[in-house]
Amino acid sequence: MIEQRGPFFPQTIRSEQQLTLLDENPDVLDRLSYVFEAIKLTKKELNNRVPLIGFAGAPWTIFCYMVEGKGSKTFSESRKLLYTNPQLAHELLERITDFTIEYMRQQQLSGVDALQLFDSWAGILGHDQYTEFGLKYVHKIASAFRGFPFTIFSKGAVASLPEIAKIESTAIGLDWNMDIQETRNLVGETRTLQGNLDPCLLYAKDSIIIKETNKLLDSFKSQRHIVNLGHGVYPDVDPEKVKILIKTVKDYEIKYN
């Protein structure tokens, strides 16, 4: 991980020979013990005041970084591999999926209250390719946690919302381009929706943050909803702006409940 740039892989995976260099049976509990220890410490400090959400990147997004080596505007090497060697792509995605299930399982055992699978680069694929190379593996992971609070977030995958709605999960995350009511009509009243404020809203004046957050809350009314951004908080955002957003939500709750 490079600060303010994101994941970096010095060795990419673009051939069968490179795939053989991966450890086939990594000890997830040992190698990522610092994550699980951090969860336990955080849970203790929180003392059940608020729920703690576990997190993992979805297989397609992890695949993009492993093939490309770093962030990209196009992820052309990753997308190219889907055409030139789909078998290799599926083999790598299967491995990522199995390790992700184990990683999230250990988070669950360490005490998280819910899990979220985050597919940041879902939107760079067309509908059919995302179904084959993305959602197939999202479904496998979600199925492994049936009965446990689980959120699926596929950024930019508007065309795939009908398929995402069919995957068993507690909640579906929305980016800021996804229509709330259309999504609600697809998933029904029992599924929780999460989102979907534009992350750039946090650069705005306080009054605008308050206005847009209240507008979002009004649009959900009494529906099942978790207020959130439509993606992550950008690195240079002033933390005070996040506090304004949170306070607005709390004030709204007091006013209408």
Which residue stretches match the model-derived regions?
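Divalent-metal (Mg2+/Mn2+/Ca2+)-assisted nucleotide/phosphate chemistry catalytic cores
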Residues: M1
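A gly/proline- and charged-residue-enriched helix-loop-helix capping module
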Residues: Q4-K44
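Active-site loop segments of alpha/beta catalytic cores
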Residues: R31-N257
